[in-house]
């Protein structure tokens, strides 16, 4: 009889523990759906608050014109605000590399070609190259038109220390060696149409059938309209906007991220900007 009593007691104890575990799991599961429940020892769970329906609102976000993009960018680097070009490039380049890592793992996209232009958009690409190298990718940079400013010389010097090859030219057949191409040629300052050597590079990229990711905007498009004066622009598979997306990307139908997360509260208030909510310490958000 003592043995039977022990077995029944043990069975009840195990059942009670299992019930607590299941109740705890249900608590967290239901909390995810904005319903707060308190696990009890009763048959059912006792509701503590009203539940709310999962109506997902469309993300509110400001799309910047070319003029406003330039104005905000200049203000960010003014003495009044305090950013430097180097700081903004580092923040942008890091978020670019983190988004690339999220979407294109190095086990599948081992070798990356980053095509950089002579301006700040190209500088973002040079920074991203360094981080992607640390993330385990085999990175090569195409930099056909070198910027002579000290900042860009220092970025190139860093690439040497990370053993990243920098090319000055490229043949169409060379693109077969890469799994992913990053378009960091032209940013929001671009006007007109692509000129040599970038017109040929854009054509080669579009003809390569490789996965292409554009930084800020697909190179060659009009920042405000999203069109191209001569139909020569990067046909990218994904775009990573910086600061805020540009007006020309309102109808962008492919995967679209926002990276950077560096607009101060004062600028947001001054220009009445609608900035999406970033998750905790995440420097990017999918649009």
From Swiss-Prot:
Q: Which GO terms describe its molecular function?
A: metal ion binding; NAD(P)HX epimerase activity; nucleotide binding
Q: What Pfam families does the entry give?
A: YjeF_N (PF03853)
Chain coiled-coil ranges = none
Q: Where do the annotations place (6S)-NADPHX binding?
A: 120-124, 187-193, 216
Q: What is the cofactor note?
A: Binds 1 potassium ion per subunit.
Q: What class of enzyme is it?
A: isomerase
Highest taxon of the lineage: Eukaryota
Asked if the Swiss-Prot or TrEMBL record annotates the protein with the keyword Transcription regulation, the reply is: no
Give me the reactions it catalyses.
(6R)-NADHX = (6S)-NADHX; (6R)-NADPHX = (6S)-NADPHX
InterPro entries reported in the protein's UniProt record: YjeF_N_dom (IPR004443), YjeF_N_dom_sf (IPR036652), YJEFN_prot_NAXE-like (IPR032976)
Please name the SUPFAM superfamilies in this protein's record: YjeF N-terminal domain-like
Keyword annotations: Isomerase, Metal-binding, NAD, NADP, Nucleotide-binding, Potassium
Q: Which cellular component terms (GO) are annotated to the entry?
A: mitochondrion
> For K(+), which residues are the binding ones?
121, 183, 219
Q: Which parts of the sequence belong to the YjeF N-terminal domain?
A: 69-275
Q: Establish whether keyword Lipid biosynthesis is in the entry.
A: no
Its cofactor is: K(+)
What EC identifiers does the entry list?
Answer: 5.1.99.6
Sequence similarity: Belongs to the NnrE/AIBP family.
State what this protein does.
Answer: Catalyzes the epimerization of the S- and R-forms of NAD(P)HX, a damaged form of NAD(P)H that is a result of enzymatic or heat-dependent hydration. This is a prerequisite for the S-specific NAD(P)H-hydrate dehydratase to allow the repair of both epimers of NAD(P)HX.
Q: Which NCBIfam families match?
A: yjeF_nterm
What is the protein name for this chain? Answer: NAD(P)H-hydrate epimerase
């Amino acid at each position: 009889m003592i043995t039977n009593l022990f077995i029944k007691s043990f069975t009840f104890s195990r059942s009670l523990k299992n019930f607590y575990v299941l109740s705890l799991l249900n608590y967290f599961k239901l909390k995810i759906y904005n319903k707060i429940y308190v696990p009890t020892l009763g048959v059912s769970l006792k509701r503590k608050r009203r539940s709310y329906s999962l109506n997902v609102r469309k993300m509110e976000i400001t799309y910047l014109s070319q003029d406003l993009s330039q104005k905000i960018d200049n203000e960010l680097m003014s003495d009044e605000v305090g950013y430097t070009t180097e700081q903004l490039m580092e923040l942008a380049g890091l978020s670019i590399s983190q988004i690339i890592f999220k979407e294109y793992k190095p086990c599948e996209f081992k070798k990356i070609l980053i095509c950089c232009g002579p301006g700040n958009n190209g500088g973002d690409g040079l920074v991203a190259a360094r981080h992607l190298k640390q993330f385990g990718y085999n990175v090569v940079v195409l930099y056909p038109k070198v910027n002579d400013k000290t900042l860009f010389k220092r970025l190139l010097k860093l690439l040497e220390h990370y053993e990243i090859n920098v090319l000055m030219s490229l043949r169409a057949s060379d693109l077969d060696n890469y799994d992913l191409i990053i378009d960091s040629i032209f940013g929001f300052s671009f006007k007109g149409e692509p000129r040599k050597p970038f017109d040929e590079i854009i054509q080669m990229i579009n003809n390569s059938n490789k996965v292409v990711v554009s930084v800020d905007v697909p190179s060659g498009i009009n920042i405000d309209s999203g069109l191209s004066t001569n139909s020569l622009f990067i046909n990218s598979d994904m775009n990573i906007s910086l600061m805020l997306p540009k007006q020309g990307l309102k109808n962008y139908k492919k995967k679209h991220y926002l990276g950077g997360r560096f607009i101060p509260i004062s600028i947001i208030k001054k220009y009445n900007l609608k900035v999406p909510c970033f998750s905790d310490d995440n420097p990017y958000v999918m649009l």
